[in-house]
Amino acid sequence: MHCPFCSAVDTKVIDSRLVGEGTQVRRRRQCVICNERFTTFEVAELVLPRVIKSNDVREPFNEEKLRSGFLKALEKRPVKSDDVEMAINHIKSQLRATGEREVPSKMIGNLVMDALKKLDKVAYIRFASVYRSFEDIREFGEEIARLQD
């Protein structure tokens, strides 16, 4: 790795440790030329699968679209933004764990519903009503009854 101070090519690692719940490696380095020390972080570059939409169109996974869906369902609900971010990261981990290059959008929708069910039941019903295209109040009642079981 190049030294950020003198641009020398040679640096040595003084210390390495896992950080960020084991998802990053923090390395303390020292330049062998100018002896300056600096810190680097290594993260695995993980690619998320492409999404197959219901009309068979394929598109890249869009984390902002996922976040937007969560935030719409959770609007004015008492859920911490950290909890939302943890749910999003968990869904991304589940998608990577499939090992598939492409996943159906329906799978992502179901993962969101599972996460919302744990985070906030009202947000779950909001999301389910749009995701499952509820037509009348009876469908709301049936979904609420399932939640109470």
From Swiss-Prot:
Zinc finger boundaries on the chain: unnamed: 3-34
Cofactor(s) of this protein: Zn(2+)
Keyword DNA-binding annotated: yes
InterPro entries: ATP-cone_dom (IPR005144), NrdR-like_N (IPR055173), RNR_NrdR-like (IPR003796)
Keywords linked to the UniProt accession: ATP-binding, DNA-binding, Metal-binding, Nucleotide-binding, Repressor, Transcription, Transcription regulation, Zinc, Zinc-finger
Single GO MF annotation: zinc ion binding
Residues annotated as domain ATP-cone: 49-139
Transmembrane regions listed in the UniProt entry: none
Any GO BP: negative regulation of DNA-templated transcription
Details of cofactor binding: Binds 1 zinc ion.
Function text: Negatively regulates transcription of bacterial ribonucleotide reductase nrd genes and operons by binding to NrdR-boxes.
Family label: Belongs to the NrdR family.
Protein name, per record: Transcriptional repressor NrdR
Lineage summary: Bacteria, Pseudomonadati, Pseudomonadota, Gammaproteobacteria, Enterobacterales
Protein's gene: nrdR
